Amino acid sequence: KTKEELFFDNTKLIPDWGNYEPERLKVFLGESSREDVAAGAQKRLEEVLSELVANAVEKTGLKKVVLSGGVFANVLLNQKIKQLPKVEDLYVFPAMSDGGLALGSALYFLSKLKIKEGVKLLPKSFGMVYFGPSYSDKEIETDLVRNKMVYKKITEPAKEIAKLIYDNKIVAFYTGRMEYGPRALGNRSIIYAPIDPTANDWLNKKLNRSEFMPFAPVTTIEQIKENYIGITDDPLVAKYMTVTYNCTEKMKKEAPACVHLDGTARPQVIKREDNPYYYDIINEYYKLSGIPTLINTSFNMHEEPIVASPEDAIRAFLDSGIDYLVMDDFLCGIDDNKHLVK
């Protein structure tokens, strides 16, 4: 419950604190906890941005809204905007923060070139944002050998990985091109069964992350309406983990590790055409468990970037003590590589 003094003056975008020196803030906030401060700030953010978007929709008559900028990494804010009565559809650029300027600048330059040619570029959606570096099997195996890793090649990777997850093993999954933007979307991910409500505590500790950092689910598109309230048949905004949805009772019961305290979750909705390998793992797990969802969290240690190279993946795997590392079709178990753990 937020403290009353944190409901800011609605005539101002920010509270009138005079300045932001820590000692003055402490006096202003009094005995308010960090959680109360965060809740108050979140509420005010939602109020201000919702008013701005509603005003823009009213003035322009345009009901399909595109959001970009670092503030829209706030997925609960995005849900509030999506639920505005006059917003027909919502899209959040996957690399919504400053990193998105690279693609935005390139598209802007391209549009200028095309205008000179008499061609107008029209908006269109793109597929998955696997725009980063990739490494061949030969490069991966070279790094495994150089690091003296014990490994094997698996012949039916989706089935074998799904079985490991079904047996409550944590899998660090590395394949193909790295994701563009802040979200791990299956090519640099740690995946795990969503059934343990305490996973948020112990898995975050294993990764040296803050205990309040929640995990997100990845769900196959065929089953999304059973799990998320108000979701459409093909939600582009949910492809990149950029918005929360209220969860059904079924989702809360079957995948409690992915559901926030307020009953929402930040899903990645996956089609097979988007990432066949990743989709097949989730689908094979669904066949074993009856649950079409896995935990998907970024493959990195706390305050480190998502792993990019095979060398990064090997180091993070050994540092974390995660049960298994899969790189393309190569499988490494932590028990087989304890001689390398520092």
Residue map of PLM features:
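Phosphate/ATP-binding catalytic cores across multiple sugar-kinase/actin-like superfamilies
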Residues: 40-65
